[in-house]
């Protein structure tokens, strides 16, 4: 956003889904913005910057609550750009349309990552943009290839964002397996849910609303004494991850924008407690049983571990 000349701002998350909270987005638009009748869009009261786009992140394999966000987009005249990098194949039931919609198909545009660790991963760096806007598609094609409209003719300053043929070939083959792999991830998640049943006070499990079909890019639990649990799992030979250890608005890259601790309390609290357990389609029942047993054993030793 900032590299494109805009000013980023952040909306807090829903405590259960970890995706953008539409109610907080509305609060931002109604409380921190005024209507700019000349531009026909909301503008920040203090900075004067217009709200031209909102980027909901489909996190951990689950889509954001798109209907509510799109309703606000229609009301306040901004574009919705989906960050679908972790949600290849995820679905959302749109009450507005009375049908299931895929991640990347609802906004004005969407970004996908094919980093090797994603549900659909290349063998190196790769990504894609989807849109129904032909003019935007042409702009993306131009920018990705050093701004060339044809070879050696540069219309604008662009960059090298080309997807090479080898990566595209791998992705084309793997795409045919994506639905099966996503279904296997759902089965792995369901087994975890059953293994941790009864321990929800110590291990808060991923929440999947009825309007969501997650593809479980990550299986993220929430615990109290995370560092100690992670250490004990590591000692048991079980790898874990933290996605993510710091809220983006508090990173050094954005310190010049004046964001402070407490601006996004839900996201900040989650960052201190979330822990990603092993998740991939081939994870076996016996492996999951061992992981769950080690987690529960560690939490029995650790007091005050509730989320």
Residue ranges of predicted features:
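Substrate-binding/gating loop at the entrance of the active-site cleft, primarily
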Residues: 1-23, 117
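Conserved G/P- and acidic residue-centered "switch" motifs that form tight phosphate/ATP-binding loops
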Residues: 5, 83, 133
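Short, glycine/acidic-enriched loop or turn micro-motifs at the edges of active sites
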Residues: 15, 61, 85-86, 281
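PLP-dependent aminotransferase class I/II
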Residues: 23, 35-49, 53-56, 62, ...
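Short, Asp-centered acidic motifs that coordinate Mg2+ and/or phosphate
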Residues: 52-53, 79, 109
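Conserved active-site segment immediately N-terminal to the catalytic lysine
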Residues: 82-121, 150-155
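Adenylate-forming
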Residues: 111, 122-126, 169-171
């Amino acid at each position: 956003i900032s590299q494109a000349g805009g000013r980023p701002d952040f909306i807090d998350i829903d405590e259960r889904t970890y995706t953008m909270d539409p109610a907080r987005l509305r609060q931002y638009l109604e409380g921190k913005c005024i209507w700019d009748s000349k531009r026909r869009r909301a503008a920040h009261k203090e900075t004067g910057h217009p709200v031209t786009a909102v980027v909901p992140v489909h996190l951990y394999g689950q889509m954001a609550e798109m209907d509510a966000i799109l309703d606000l987009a229609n009301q306040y005249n901004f574009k919705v750009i989906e960050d679908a990098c972790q949600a290849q194949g995820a679905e959302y039931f749109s009450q507005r349309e009375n049908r299931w919609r895929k991640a990347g198909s609802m906004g004005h545009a969407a970004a996908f990552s094919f980093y090797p660790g994603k549900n659909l991963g290349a063998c190196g760096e790769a990504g894609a943009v989807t849109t129904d806007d032909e003019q935007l598609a042409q702009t993306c094609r131009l920018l990705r290839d050093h701004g060339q409209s044809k070879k050696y003719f540069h219309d604008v300053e662009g960059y090298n964002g080309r997807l090479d043929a080898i990566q595209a070939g791998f992705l084309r083959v793997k795409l045919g397996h994506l639905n099966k792999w996503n279904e296997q991830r759902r089965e792995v998640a369901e087994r975890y849910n059953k293994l941790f049943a009864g321990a929800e006070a110590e291990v808060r499990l991923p929440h999947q609303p009825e309007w969501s079909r997650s593809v479980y890019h990550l299986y993220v639990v929430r615990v109290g004494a995370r560092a100690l649990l992670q250490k004990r799992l590591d000692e048991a030979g079980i790898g874990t991850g933290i996605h993510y250890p710091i809220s983006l608005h508090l990173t050094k890259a954005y310190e010049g924008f004046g964001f402070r601790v407490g601006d996004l309390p839900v996201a900040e609290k989650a960052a201190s407690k979330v822990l990603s357990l092993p998740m991939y389609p081939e994870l076996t029942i016996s492996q999951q049983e061992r992981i769950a047993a080690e987690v529960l054993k560690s939490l029995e030793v650790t007091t005050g571990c509730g989320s």
